Amino acid sequence: MTDLIHDATLDATGLNCPEPVMMLHKHVRELAAGGVLKVIATDPSTRRDIPKFCVFLGHELLGQQEEAGTYLYWIRKKAD
């Protein structure tokens, strides 16, 4: 997958659960409705936690990929 166009980036590299999701929650709150956030993480638990976060809060997971132990996610914030 190529890098999707995004409005903001959250670099959670080196952080472990629950920090990436806590930071994700803060960054999504600050994002405009319909905005896209790119998340960069190294914690494997984000493969489970970030999709569940999106489903639970109604945001759209546009894409995810893994590159040599780095996990990338693109999330579109739901409309207000």
Swiss-Prot record:
Q: Which UniProt keywords apply?
A: Cytoplasm
**An MF annotation (GO) of this entry:** sulfur carrier activity
Compartments, as annotated in UniProt? Cytoplasm
Q: Which SUPFAM superfamilies match?
A: SirA-like
For biological process, the GO terms are:
tRNA wobble position uridine thiolation
Which cellular component, as a GO term, is one annotated location? Answer: cytoplasm
Which sites are catalytic? 17
Q: Which Pfam families match?
A: TusA
- Give the matching HAMAP family: Thiourid_synth_A
Q: Which family does it belong to?
A: Belongs to the sulfur carrier protein TusA family.
Entries under PANTHER family matching the protein: SULFUR CARRIER PROTEIN TUSA (PTHR33279:SF2), SULFUR CARRIER PROTEIN YEDF-RELATED (PTHR33279)
Question: What's the protein name?
Answer: Sulfur carrier protein TusA
Q: Which gene encodes it?
A: tusA
